[in-house]
């Protein structure tokens, strides 16, 4: 359709439903560049209908290549687990909803075939806030079957908000042996938006899955706000550090594994202490305990929160303490109660960077005496997934403590390196 204004300006595009709060004389149009505008129609303006589209017609995901590519010899399997990368805007409500499946993503981004022959399936169609430990198990099972079938790598398309939890969980499930990369990726902006990062991230992920020399669980997302390179972060070391930026994901207390250049077809390793592709077979240790909680210490009723979780039968609790990992004096009594009930209390720090040290102040020493388990420099996401994984294998408190203090998948460092702290002060 066209809106022809009395001043001679013309707006062309597809008529979209308007929001319930829009002015009654406003027309919402999706322009050819993918952006929506609202045009206030008044006297002297004309609306010309040029044609119609069937509801559900795919939007901005348009193949960029005029001629089809010959698929590469490598084989990569894409597992769809929902999230923004497989979503689009619902123009009736203005909200982002799950819409596309993994096969649609693969077919609408033909550049993927430069690096691998693609097969895909949709395992879940959810937004990532609905992810659960039982779904981690399903992803592990499916990825394991794919790798057993001889694929060169696996890509899991996942929502970004809880991706670090899932990446950590998969890292522990595969920590005993992984022959090829398992890559998690997503997008900060839905696939039907012109500013979407879906195609770039998915292409970089397929490149990593098919040709990267490492055989680990990793998250591959934009490394900067442009479209130059993506970063591959070790699954147990990554965290989403910004709500909306393309380069929201960072490695915490650790270096990324690699830079991925999807337009050049190049993988630049940033470290050499990684598990090599093909040097080990597949060994899966799947299973997670769902009754694990993650709570943040705050000035107030933290002891009552811990007590309530114990009363409700939770099997383990991760507490984000302040600074070195401290909690209030009242909460120490709750840690003692948890120990007496055989429930592990793991301590991480709210500061994100740095490590838990309960040997500096008297509060920390009292916490250790009460039974708290320090998580070192683990992220809270990794600590949560690790505790969930351990509790699916044993409930004996001392065994849990010993297993938690073992470095299974590179989730903790023996010493802290100051230069790994990324200053984000803006100056």
Swiss-Prot record:
Chain ranges of the Asparaginase/glutaminase domain: 74-407
GO biological process entries: amino acid metabolic process; regulation of translational fidelity; translation
Alphabetical list of Gene3D superfamilies matching this protein: 2.30.30.520, 3.40.50.40, L-asparaginase, N-terminal domain (3.40.50.1170)
Substrates-to-products reaction catalysed: L-glutamyl-tRNA(Gln) + L-glutamine + ATP + H2O = L-glutaminyl-tRNA(Gln) + L-glutamate + ADP + phosphate + H(+)
Any one GO molecular-function label of the UniProt entry: asparaginase activity
Residues annotated as catalytic: 84, 160-161, 240
Enzyme Commission numbers on file: 6.3.5.-
Short name of one Pfam family: Asparaginase_C
Keywords from the named record: ATP-binding, Ligase, Nucleotide-binding, Protein biosynthesis
InterPro entries, per the entry: AsnA_fam, Asp/glu_Ase-like_sf, Asparaginase/glutaminase-like, Asparaginase/glutaminase_AS2, Asparaginase_C, GatD, GatD_N, GatD_N_sf
Highest taxon in the source lineage: Archaea
EC class (word): ligase
Similarity section: Belongs to the asparaginase 1 family. GatD subfamily.
NCBIfam families: asnASE_I, gatD_arch, PRK04183.1
Subunit: Heterodimer of GatD and GatE.
UniProt xrefs under PANTHER family: 60 KDA LYSOPHOSPHOLIPASE (PTHR11707:SF28), L-ASPARAGINASE (PTHR11707)
Record function comment: Allows the formation of correctly charged Gln-tRNA(Gln) through the transamidation of misacylated Glu-tRNA(Gln) in organisms which lack glutaminyl-tRNA synthetase. The reaction takes place in the presence of glutamine and ATP through an activated gamma-phospho-Glu-tRNA(Gln). The GatDE system is specific for glutamate and does not act on aspartate.
This protein's name: Glutamyl-tRNA(Gln) amidotransferase subunit D
Organism this protein belongs to: Aeropyrum pernix (strain ATCC 700893 / DSM 11879 / JCM 9820 / NBRC 100138 / K1)
Gene: gatD
């Amino acid at each position: 359709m066209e809106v022809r204004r009395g001043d001679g300006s013309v707006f062309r595009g597809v008529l979209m439903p308007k929001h319930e709060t829009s002015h009654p004389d406003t027309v919402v149009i999706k322009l050819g560049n993918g952006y929506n505008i609202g045009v206030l129609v008044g006297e002297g303006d004309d609306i010309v209908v040029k044609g119609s589209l069937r509801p559900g017609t795919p939007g901005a995901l348009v193949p960029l290549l005029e001629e089809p590519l010959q698929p590469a010899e490598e084989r990569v399997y894409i597992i769809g687990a929902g999230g923004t990368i497989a979503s689009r805007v619902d123009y009736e409500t203005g909200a982002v909803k799950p819409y596309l499946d993994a096969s649609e993503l693969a077919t609408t981004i033909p550049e993927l075939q430069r690096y691998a022959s693609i097969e895909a399936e949709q395992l879940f169609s959810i937004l990532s806030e609905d992810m659960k430990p039982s779904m981690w198990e399903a992803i592990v099972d499916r990825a394991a079957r794919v790798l057993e079938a001889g694929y060169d790598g696996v890509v899991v398309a996942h929502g970004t908000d809880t991706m670090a939890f899932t990446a950590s969980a998969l890292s522990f499930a595969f920590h005993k042996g992984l022959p090829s990369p398992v890559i998690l990726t997503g997008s900060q902006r839905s696939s039907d938006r012109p500013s979407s990062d879906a195609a770039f991230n998915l292409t970089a992920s397929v490149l990593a899955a098919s040709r990267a020399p490492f055989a680990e669980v990793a998250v591959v997302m934009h490394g900067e706000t442009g479209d130059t390179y993506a970063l591959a972060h070790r699954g147990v070391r990554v965290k989403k550090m910004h709500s909306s930026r393309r380069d929201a994901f960072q490695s915490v207390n650790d270096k990324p594994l690699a830079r991925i250049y999807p337009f050049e077809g190049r993988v630049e390793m940033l470290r050499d202490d990684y598990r090599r592709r093909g040097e080990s077979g597949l060994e899966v240790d799947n299973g997670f305990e769902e009754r694990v909680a993650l709570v943040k210490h705050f000035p107030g009723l933290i002891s009552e929160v811990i007590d309530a979780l114990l009363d409700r039968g939770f099997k383990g609790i991760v507490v984000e303490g302040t600074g070195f990992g401290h909690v209030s004096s009242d909460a120490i009594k709750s840690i003692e109660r948890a120990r007496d009930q055989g429930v592990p209390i793991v301590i991480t720090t709210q500061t994100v960077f740095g490590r838990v040290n309960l040997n500096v102040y008297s509060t920390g020493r009292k916490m250790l005496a009460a039974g708290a388990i320090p998580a070192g420099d683990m992220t809270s996401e990794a600590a949560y997934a690790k505790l969930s994984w351990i509790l699916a294998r044993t409930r004996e408190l001392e065994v849990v403590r010993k297993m938690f203090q073992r470095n299974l998948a590179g989730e903790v460092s023996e010493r802290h390196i100051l230069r790994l702290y990324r200053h984000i002060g803006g100056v």
